[in-house]
Amino acid sequence: MKGLQTAEAMLEAADADFHVAIAGVAAVDVDGQVILDLDGKPLMVEDSRATVRINKDGTYDALSTVGTRYVVQQNLDCLNRALDIVNSRGDAIVDTCGVLKGGREFFASIDLGGLIIDPTGVNDKIERFLLVRNGHDGKTPITYANTSVRAVCK
């Protein structure tokens, strides 16, 4: 999605306004049947959790398995933190926003405005962006990067 100014509007338009939750991981056999312990309870994998996308219609999508120390960082929180970094809530433009791999990865870029260099020459305009990236996979850290390279094509 391109060109909306609030984090909420951009996330909604990009279908990235879902929440991610942590769930336990139960062992299943090759046929997909939950394996039960001697008490008849699901056999849980103790050192793993799953990240789960909660969709607007109330359904769930499994995203990844993570360790027990993993803490979910919601897409809205990551984007609002980026807007806080640029000290803006409405005048910086959330340029692009989206998710990859069914929601496992989130990205956004905030247009910080152009910088004119060499005003007596060719007047090159360098676009500046704050890139935001996060993964709900336990492997991709939250990244905030200042860049002059567009993260996605126009």
Predicted regions located by residue number:
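Feature for intrinsically disordered/low-complexity regulatory segments and propeptides
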Residues: 1-81, 90
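Intrinsic disorder/low-complexity polar-acidic segments
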Residues: 80-154
